[in-house]
Amino acid sequence: MSSGGLLLLLGLLTLWAELTPVSSRDRPKFCYLPAEPGECNAYMPSFYYDSASNKCKKFIYGGCRGNANNFKTRDECHHTCVASGKGIQPRIGSN
């Protein structure tokens, strides 16, 4: 196979990996943890995955402790934890 063909194949595989949705069995276990604001008093708008609604929701993180179900953007939460059996998940905004 030519180097151009290999490059095309690599590009297609990369695109496929980016667009493939997370299935519930592939979802990291920390996605099932509840929102945990932590013990400190900072005001850091963050997002957590709510497994009951299969959506990322906003919460206020206090800045320390907490758990791994804590994302700076909705987009990061969505691509890590949201699952759908209906095909490709579109990218969403960060707010």
Curated annotation (Swiss-Prot):
It is found in: Secreted. InterPro entries: Kunitz_BPTI (IPR002223), Kunitz_BPTI_sf (IPR036880), Prtase_inh_Kunz-CS (IPR020901), TFPI/VKTCI-like (IPR050098). GO terms for molecular function: serine-type endopeptidase inhibitor activity. SMART domains: KU (SM00131). Residues 1-24 form the signal peptide. Residues 31-81 form the BPTI/Kunitz inhibitor domain. The record marks 41-42 as: Reactive bond. The keyword Transmembrane helix does not apply. Pfam families: Kunitz_BPTI. The keyword Secreted applies. Residues 92-95 form a propeptide. It comes from the Eukaryota. Disulfide bonds join 31-81, 40-64, 56-77. Keywords: Disulfide bond, Protease inhibitor, Secreted, Serine protease inhibitor, Signal. Expressed by the venom gland. One of its GO terms (cellular component) is extracellular space. Belongs to the venom Kunitz-type family. Serine protease inhibitor. This is Kunitz-type serine protease inhibitor ki-VN. It comes from Vipera nikolskii (Nikolsky's adder).
